[in-house]
Amino acid sequence: PVVWWCFAFFFLSTMTLAIVQTFSVSILQAMHHVSFEAATLTLTAYMLCAAAGMFLGGFVASRFPLRSDRVVASCMTLAALLMALCGSGWFNGTFAMVILASTGLAIGVGGPSRDMMIKKATPKGATGRVYGMVYSGLDVGFATSPLVFGVFMDRGWYGLTLVGGACVMLLSVMVALGVGKRSQAQKLVAER
């Protein structure tokens, strides 16, 4: 059912967030030799950009209410590309920090549409059960990500940790599009 797709979306997208929150400071220090203060400022900028993106994303969600899955997919694709660029090592520390903070903006813009996507996937009368199930994907993603990507960090694969996060985010894009497709099919069946 579509609820499991929603769970998978939250699981995968949160794995990427956990990488940023848990490892980005260490990655920036190891790859780009930036100071601890600059690296933590980048994490703060990421969070503030995500909050600003959420604000902007509210306008985007109201402008494209029928295409929430596509808005989410577009924002997450952009964020994945930015995260992969940051992990590539092609740029100096300052530019890498700006790119990582911009990733937060892209993810934030998709946030309100993400919530609308979940709302559309929820059958009538099942809101509490669905939201409880779906949002538990956040906890599972946060718990799983350090186990997987901590191994990368331990081996010194700092850039690959971010590139791996970008790949996981692209998987969440595919799942978001699957949620939209299944929600539409579920709606058509209910209308018959």
Predicted regions located by residue number:
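Extracytoplasmic gate region of multi-pass secondary transporters
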Residues: 2-47, 51-54
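Loop-to-transmembrane helix entry/capping segments in MFS-fold secondary transporters
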Residues: 36-37, 124-134
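Helix-to-loop junctions at the C-terminal end of transmembrane segments
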Residues: 54-67, 153-154
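Structural signature of the two symmetry-related core transmembrane helices
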Residues: 70-85
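A membrane-interface helix-boundary motif in multi-pass transporters
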Residues: 151-168
